[in-house]
């Protein structure tokens, strides 16, 4: 795991060449076919030589949830072990990592009807309405979630609505379900002490994405697929900002600056 442009894929490839491992992607966007440039998906040549599980598995007509990722990952761990290999998870979707490690077995499936009701409430109220609602229902979880992190706020409210339990309670009560009790887990985190250099790499990569056709890619995906309002790609870094640009909400300069800012968080 590590921040954007920190060299996760390169390190994973080096480890693949040296050890008896299989790579499993931990990325909420790379799992979708066609979402290539904006997700910095490895090229077809790289994927051919260094296969990644959970890359190009889903159509954008589908919504791939955290619960599905955890279920798929647990199955893959068993399959990889059956081949006498070690699974190496690589990616930057921290919610996926945390959910897999801490356990998500007790969390309910998504409720699209309830989510739509929340979005209607948000549209009729101010931008922080959902966060304030979460704060009233689960202060402990609200304190660790950013007020603009709509995805996690909606999920927490959904859990409360479905189970009657707070998300903070669910996480704590699920601590005995973690992978740490079943497997020997080694976590590798890439930490770049030179933040200025890291930010420069992020900026360069975003420039390359735009030159390689990020806007054209997103335009093609939006025209081809009917994306539900809750679809993860609509809130994904690079895709969210490009869609806003295509809708005329921001100009190209703002697209770059907003995507750059989001990538640095």
Language model features: what each stretch is:
Residues 1-264:
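Phosphate/pyrophosphate-binding catalytic cores of soluble transferases and nucleic-acid-acting enzymes
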């Amino acid at each position: 795991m590590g921040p954007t442009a920190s060299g996760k894929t390169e390190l994973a490839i080096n480890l693949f060449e040296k050890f008896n491992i299989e790579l499993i992607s931990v990325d909420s966007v790379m799992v979708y076919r066609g979402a290539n440039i904006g997700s910095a998906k490895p090229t077809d040549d790289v994927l051919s030589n260094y296969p990644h599980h959970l890359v190009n598995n889903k159509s954008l007509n589908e919504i791939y949830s955290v619960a599905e990722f955890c279920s798929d990952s647990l199955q893959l761990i068993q399959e990889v072990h059956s081949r006498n290999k070690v699974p190496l998870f690589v990616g930057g979707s921290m919610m996926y990592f945390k959910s897999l490690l801490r356990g998500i077995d007790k969390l309910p499936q998504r409720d699209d009807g309830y989510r739509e009701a929340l979005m209607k409430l948000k549209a009729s109220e101010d931008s922080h309405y959902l966060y304030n609602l979460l704060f009233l229902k689960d202060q402990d979880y609200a304190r660790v979630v950013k007020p603009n992190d709509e995805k996690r706020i909606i999920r927490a409210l959904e859990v409360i609505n479905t189970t009657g339990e707070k998300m903070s309670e669910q996480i704590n009560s699920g601590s005995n379900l973690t992978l740490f009790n079943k497997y020997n887990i080694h976590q590798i985190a890439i930490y770049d002490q030179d933040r200025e250099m890291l930010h420069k790499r992020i900026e360069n990569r975003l420039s390359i994405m735009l030159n390689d056709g990020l806007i054209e890619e997103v335009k093609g995906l939006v025209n081809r697929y009917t994306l539900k309002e809750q679809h993860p790609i609509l809130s994904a870094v690079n895709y969210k900002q490009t869609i806003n640009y295509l809708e005329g909400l921001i100009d190209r300069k703002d697209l770059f600056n907003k995507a750059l800012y989001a990538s640095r968080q």
